[in-house]
Amino acid sequence: VPAHFLHCNGRHHTIALAAFPIPKRIHHFMLQANTIDDVGYAFDRLDAAGRITSLLGRHTNDHTISFYADTPSPMIEVEFGWGPRTVDSSWTVVRHNRTALWGHKSVRGQR
């Protein structure tokens, strides 16, 4: 599914738009951690609670290392990540054929 990543600041993207064939209006939102250790601590806690939906991985577009988890809303996930790429006016748009350099394996309902 093609996605369009838009930004209004130095982050690679602030919002992404895509026509997924699912009833969700918002797929997920991201919380940015201060350290990679914060990501690890959050992963351990959410894994122990059985909330992980996608394992650790690194996105192709913004290079964020993150994982996904269920929220109290059945329709929205949270991405918890660290280390996103920043861009400026010299940034050139790049097309990617996959969402992750590594990881982000879906484990919904398996943990």
Regions found by a protein language model. Give the residues of each.
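Core segments of cupin and vicinal oxygen chelate
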Residues: V1-H13, D44
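Aromatic/pi-system hotspot detector in well-structured domains
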Residues: H13-I15, H59
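Amphipathic N-proximal alpha-helical interface segments
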Residues: L17-A19
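Long C-terminal interaction/binding lobes of large macromolecular proteins
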Residues: P23
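Vicinal oxygen chelate
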Residues: L31-Q110
